[in-house]
């Protein structure tokens, strides 16, 4: 009986927890316009760093306009409303990508963004159309758009390495949360305790 209970417990943990190791991503073609990101055109890192996430947001919105037109998607959403299916960390992710390799400026790149937690929940079955009737976070029109993007393979669920390696996230972007940094901190704390314990014991 104890073995059976253990099997049930492990099965429950796996069935409830495996979704955490998958996250929903959307792949967009982003034109990294030089005039927006490097006005002087000299690839000076200090100057490019002055472009905040607000400077990257219009590039993401523009990519949605291009996508909707290119794929003939049926939606009444503006590019601003459509881009809200992305995580609030999207502009920051794109900015970090550019700062790591300034040579991408002026190119059109294929970039994977996290969707927001509501879209992720919808594709994992936690969020339904019925449950969002009075929600300000997601609309039926956005879910219609998501369904079309899933059919096209533009939105997919993939292994969430960020969950294993990332740091904690704010309430505004829970989809970007991870426990990697916490694990490192816990490891060093245990190491310190172990060292102190050995010295005191000796």
Predicted regions: what they are:
Residues 1-12:
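N-terminal signal-anchor/first transmembrane alpha helix
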Residues 8, 25, 198:
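Glycine-rich, histidine-containing beta strand-loop boundary motifs that form or position
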Residues 13-175:
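Membrane-topology segments of multi-pass transport proteins
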Residues 179-202:
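Transmembrane alpha-helix signature in integral membrane proteins
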